[in-house]
Amino acid sequence: MNRQRPVALVTGGRRGIGLGIARALAAKGFDLAITDVENDETVIHELRGMGGKVAFFRGDLAAVETHAATVAAVLKEFGSIDCLVNNAGMGSVERGDFLGLKPENFDTIMGVNLRGTVFFTQAVVKAMLAATEVRFPRSIITISSVSSVMTSPERLDYCISKAGLTAFVQGLALRLAEARIGVFEVRPGIIRTDMTAKVAERYDTLIDGGLVPMKRWGEVGDVGAIVAGLAGGNFIFATGSVINADGGLSIAKL
């Protein structure tokens, strides 16, 4: 297969931050493999209109047993994977006091955010390392959250899942450094998406009060621009780095 463009695989690329990332990568010249639990033909059509090849692959991140087949389908369609963006994830099943946290809810979020991401990455890395030809810079970019280091007691399970990703990224960066695959973590802060729309009024007040030093919401395009920059290959020597996409939210203050 004669490839003229690099290929990025974006999990959860159908909406929200994932869609913002997909748009930015398409604008950067990437072909796109989008995975999600549901398809949205309008989104796929929009991304194809940006000039590259785009294909959708249905997949549930929690279903680890399906990961190898999903990666194989992507390879059959595109020939290789140059960039993996681990974006898919979920919030707490129920917010509330830690004393009321249910084991089944804890297992659900870990199954998607941590276990699912770790083993999907494993499947992609095996394919990357097996590639006989490397034509473009390669990277694995994991979208975690400022919640990996800034805790919220009412959604402690979510914070734990993101903190686990932080540890994973560091170990993965060491494992893949010699293969010259850049590994990065991007931590979004308060980002305007359909998931945050239900608490927009609360966040508006907090942002106006100075919680975010830039005093504005983050947009999905802010995260997308960071990911596209990392995927381009110019920051390979900074492997293992963490980028806070939060307008200064996580800066330690007196």
Task: Put a short name on every predicted segment.
Residues 14-15:
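Conserved glycine-rich cofactor-binding loop
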Residues 95, 210, 228, 239-254:
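Short C-terminal tail/terminal secondary-structure segment
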Residues 95-98, 102-107, 208:
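Substrate-binding pocket helix/loop in short-chain dehydrogenase/reductase
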Residues 121, 161, 169:
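Active-site helix of classical SDR
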Residues 126, 174-175, 236:
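Alpha-helical segment proximal to the catalytic Tyr-Lys
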Residues 145:
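Residue(s) in the substrate-gating loop at a strand-loop-helix junction
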Residues 177-182, 238-240:
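Short, small/polar-rich loop/turn modules that mediate ligand/substrate recognition or access, typified
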